[in-house]
């Protein structure tokens, strides 16, 4: 078997900025009466007959076990005193662009991963600041002073560890992992916290008695590749803190979609939803093959009179999981106004795409 040298570039200074419960935080900033209340971004199930899904929620709501992609009905059952807000996504995008302008004051090497998070390479920066920690603190300060929003920051020598670090002390946290500290940091981390390891994969790793980074470190590269395919190669390196992926500004935003036109109009709701599921499956399979994950799910419905409706849902975390795409596509469809005319076309699209590296995915799809 070919073996490649483990080249680890520790000279870079990478920051990962992740806004804290961004959509909910913007709503709380704009409406001070929401302070200290559980806030859920999603349709109120009391107004939709139980339909709807949670886009995100604030930390107060998370205390009740509410999380993104949960049905609004279950969220209400867990937290009946929550304030449900349908969400103003165009406003969130505007605020997201304001945040990016702050990033650009420090470096042009900014790689947005979504509307509320980005990687920054500040190895060399516009202000000539040698300390990446100081840059991260200044960015946190600027975002608070200008926008009255908090973010968490991770600072390290690569994107993988910087992302893990930004999740370590939320909200409004700053975690620094130096090259000489990376191995101990990763050893203590539960394997489920490694970005790129989905729930099913965690189960498979647990079956191998791999529960932490320290456990993963003991497994040979050959064993990991044999069990997980190409991704085993990446796991072996990440366990050692090796990830030389560059910060890529101006990343091309693409979408993955599937739509079908029906010669025979669809009238029956069961038939329509069965076709939605087929589209969702094709999208998930295409995303997994392309090694992409997305945060926005869009459905498109064209009726017999050629009128067309599109509706989208933005998730708190990116996905390529079929069950998630299927469930949310159905939830979005349920929110459309009833139309008795037949359906001529159905489409499902996953957009807001990014590379699966550093994100949640299912290793079963890579074996």
UniProtKB/Swiss-Prot annotation:
GO terms for cellular component: cytosol. Signal peptide: none annotated. Mg(2+) binds at residues 18, 116. This is DNA polymerase IV. Monomer. It comes from Streptococcus thermophilus (strain ATCC BAA-250 / LMG 18311). Residues 14-198 form the UmuC domain. Belongs to the DNA polymerase type-Y family. Binds 2 magnesium ions per subunit.
């Amino acid at each position: 078997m070919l073996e490649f040298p483990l080249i680890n570039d520790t000279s870079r200074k990478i920051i990962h900025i992740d806004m804290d419960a961004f959509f909910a935080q913007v709503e709380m900033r704009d409406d001070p009466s929401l302070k200290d209340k559980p806030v859920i971004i999603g349709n109120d199930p009391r107004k939709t007959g139980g339909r709807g899904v949670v886009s995100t929620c604030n930390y107060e709501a998370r205390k009740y076990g509410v999380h993104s992609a949960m049905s609004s009905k279950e969220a209400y059952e867990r937290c009946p005193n929550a304030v449900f807000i349908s969400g103003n996504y165009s406003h969130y995008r505007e605020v997201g662009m304001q945040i990016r302008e702050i990033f650009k004051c420090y470096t042009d090497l900014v790689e947005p991963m979504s509307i509320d998070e980005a990687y920054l390479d500040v190895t060399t920066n516009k202000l000539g600041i040698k300390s990446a920690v100081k840059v991260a603190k200044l960015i946190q300060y600027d975002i608070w002073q200008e926008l009255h929003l908090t973010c968490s920051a991770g600072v390290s020598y690569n994107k993988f560890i910087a992302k893990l670090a930004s999740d370590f002390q939320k909200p409004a946290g700053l975690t620094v992992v130096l090259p000489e500290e990376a191995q101990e940091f990763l050893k203590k981390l539960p394997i489920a916290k490694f970005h790129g390891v989905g729930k099913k994969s965690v189960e498979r790793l647990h079956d191998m008695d791999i529960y932490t980074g320290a456990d993963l470190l003991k497994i040979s590269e050959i064993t990991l590749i044999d069990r997980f395919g190409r991704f085993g190669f990446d796991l072996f390196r990440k366990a050692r803190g090796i990830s030389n992926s560059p910060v890529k500004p101006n990343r091309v935003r693409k979408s993955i979609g599937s739509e079908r036109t029906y010669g025979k109009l669809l009238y029956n709701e069961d038939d329509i939803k069965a076709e939605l599921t087929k589209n969702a499956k094709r999208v998930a399979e295409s995303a997994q093959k392309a090694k992409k994950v997305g945060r926005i799910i869009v459905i498109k419905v064209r009726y017999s009179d050629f009128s067309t409706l599109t509706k989208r849902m933005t998730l708190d975390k990116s996905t390529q999981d079929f069950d998630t795409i299927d469930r949310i596509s159905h939830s979005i469809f349920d929110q459309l106004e009833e139309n008795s005319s037949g359906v001529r076309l159905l489409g499902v699209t996953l957009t807001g795409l990014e590379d699966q590296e550093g994100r949640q995915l299912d290793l079963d799809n890579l074996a």
